[in-house]
């Protein structure tokens, strides 16, 4: 009986783990990230980039998947006014990597997603010979569980981003009223 319970537990853990994907992995299905998203947390090794009025304090509204690119629709807040910003990210030659020009040259991957609830993105920006990295946690709903937020914080730490540079935006003005 104990063996049967252990087998069931093991199979359950395998099934739960199998539902997560990475854009650099073989099991990644880009079509499944299509649709509405909300910015939950931003993190960066240059915190000023994601603070109020920072150029990378962007609130994701939608990802539209095309054949070799992604159309990303964001909102940004400047002087308490919401503005819409759209950009096209093109596939690069590296598996699961996309590039976009915005305040420099950016490449990004999606290290983790379960498609239905959350998406974690890792971006590297290069501008004027300097680089910084940014990570974002996005949800299908306006907020996510503390467990997912903690997993994101641990992923940030693995990329060298300190916890004090992680900003939870779930209670910030994310221009939710500007969504169509």
UniProtKB/Swiss-Prot annotation:
<keyword id="KW-1015">Disulfide bond</keyword>
<dbReference type="GO" id="GO:0005550">
    <property type="term" value="F:pheromone binding"/>
</dbReference>
<dbReference type="GO" id="GO:0005615">
    <property type="term" value="C:extracellular space"/>
</dbReference>
<dbReference type="GO" id="GO:0005634">
    <property type="term" value="C:nucleus"/>
</dbReference>
<dbReference type="GO" id="GO:0045834">
    <property type="term" value="P:positive regulation of lipid metabolic process"/>
</dbReference>
<keyword id="KW-0964">Secreted</keyword>
<dbReference type="InterPro" id="IPR002345">
    <property type="entry name" value="Lipocalin"/>
</dbReference>
<dbReference type="GO" id="GO:0045892">
    <property type="term" value="P:negative regulation of DNA-templated transcription"/>
</dbReference>
<dbReference type="InterPro" id="IPR022272">
    <property type="entry name" value="Lipocalin_CS"/>
</dbReference>
<keyword id="KW-0732">Signal</keyword>
<keyword id="KW-0813">Transport</keyword>
<dbReference type="InterPro" id="IPR000566">
    <property type="entry name" value="Lipocln_cytosolic_FA-bd_dom"/>
</dbReference>
<dbReference type="GO" id="GO:0071396">
    <property type="term" value="P:cellular response to lipid"/>
</dbReference>
<dbReference type="GO" id="GO:0051897">
    <property type="term" value="P:positive regulation of phosphatidylinositol 3-kinase/protein kinase B signal transduction"/>
</dbReference>
<dbReference type="GO" id="GO:0010628">
    <property type="term" value="P:positive regulation of gene expression"/>
</dbReference>
<dbReference type="GO" id="GO:0036094">
    <property type="term" value="F:small molecule binding"/>
</dbReference>
<dbReference type="InterPro" id="IPR012674">
    <property type="entry name" value="Calycin"/>
</dbReference>
<dbReference type="GO" id="GO:0005009">
    <property type="term" value="F:insulin receptor activity"/>
</dbReference>
<dbReference type="GO" id="GO:0045475">
    <property type="term" value="P:locomotor rhythm"/>
</dbReference>
<dbReference type="GO" id="GO:0006112">
    <property type="term" value="P:energy reserve metabolic process"/>
</dbReference>
<dbReference type="Pfam" id="PF00061">
    <property type="entry name" value="Lipocalin"/>
</dbReference>
<dbReference type="GO" id="GO:0010907">
    <property type="term" value="P:positive regulation of glucose metabolic process"/>
</dbReference>
<dbReference type="GO" id="GO:0042593">
    <property type="term" value="P:glucose homeostasis"/>
</dbReference>
<dbReference type="GO" id="GO:0005829">
    <property type="term" value="C:cytosol"/>
</dbReference>
<feature type="disulfide bond">
    <location>
        <begin position="82"/>
        <end position="175"/>
    </location>
</feature>
<dbReference type="GO" id="GO:0005186">
    <property type="term" value="F:pheromone activity"/>
</dbReference>
<dbReference type="GO" id="GO:0051055">
    <property type="term" value="P:negative regulation of lipid biosynthetic process"/>
</dbReference>
<feature type="signal peptide">
    <location>
        <begin position="1"/>
        <end position="18"/>
    </location>
</feature>
<dbReference type="GO" id="GO:0010888">
    <property type="term" value="P:negative regulation of lipid storage"/>
</dbReference>
<dbReference type="GO" id="GO:0045721">
    <property type="term" value="P:negative regulation of gluconeogenesis"/>
</dbReference>
<dbReference type="InterPro" id="IPR002971">
    <property type="entry name" value="Maj_urinary"/>
</dbReference>
<keyword id="KW-0590">Pheromone-binding</keyword>
<dbReference type="GO" id="GO:0035634">
    <property type="term" value="P:response to stilbenoid"/>
</dbReference>
<dbReference type="GO" id="GO:0061179">
    <property type="term" value="P:negative regulation of insulin secretion involved in cellular response to glucose stimulus"/>
</dbReference>
<protein>
    <recommendedName>
        <fullName>Major urinary protein 1</fullName>
    </recommendedName>
</protein>
<dbReference type="GO" id="GO:0007005">
    <property type="term" value="P:mitochondrion organization"/>
</dbReference>
<dbReference type="GO" id="GO:0071240">
    <property type="term" value="P:cellular response to food"/>
</dbReference>
<dbReference type="GO" id="GO:0009267">
    <property type="term" value="P:cellular response to starvation"/>
</dbReference>
<comment type="function">
    <text>Binds pheromones that are released from drying urine of males. These pheromones affect the sexual behavior of females.</text>
</comment>
<comment type="similarity">
    <text>Belongs to the calycin superfamily. Lipocalin family.</text>
</comment>
<dbReference type="GO" id="GO:0009060">
    <property type="term" value="P:aerobic respiration"/>
</dbReference>
<dbReference type="GO" id="GO:0031649">
    <property type="term" value="P:heat generation"/>
</dbReference>
């Amino acid at each position: 009986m104990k063996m049967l319970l252990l087998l069931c537990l093991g199979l359950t853990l395998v099934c739960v783990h199998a539902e997560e994907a990475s854009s650099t992995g073989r099991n990644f299905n880009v079509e499944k990230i299509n649709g509405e998203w909300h910015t939950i947390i931003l993190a960066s090794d240059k915190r000023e980039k994601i603070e109020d009025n920072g150029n990378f304090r962007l609130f994701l509204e939608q990802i539209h998947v095309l054949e070799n690119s992604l159309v990303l629709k964001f909102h940004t807040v400047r002087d308490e006014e919401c503005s819409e910003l759209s950009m096209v990210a093109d596939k690069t030659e590296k598996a699961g990597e996309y590039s976009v020009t915005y305040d420099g040259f950016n490449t990004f991957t999606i290290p983790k997603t379960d498609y239905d609830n959350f998406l974690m993105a890792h971006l590297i920006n290069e501008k004027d010979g300097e680089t910084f990295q940014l990570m974002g946690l996005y949800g299908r709903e306006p907020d996510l569980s503390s467990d997912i937020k903690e997993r994101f914080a641990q992923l940030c730490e693995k990329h060298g981003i300190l916890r004090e540079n992680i900003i939870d935006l779930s209670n910030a003005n994310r221009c939710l009223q500007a969504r169509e």
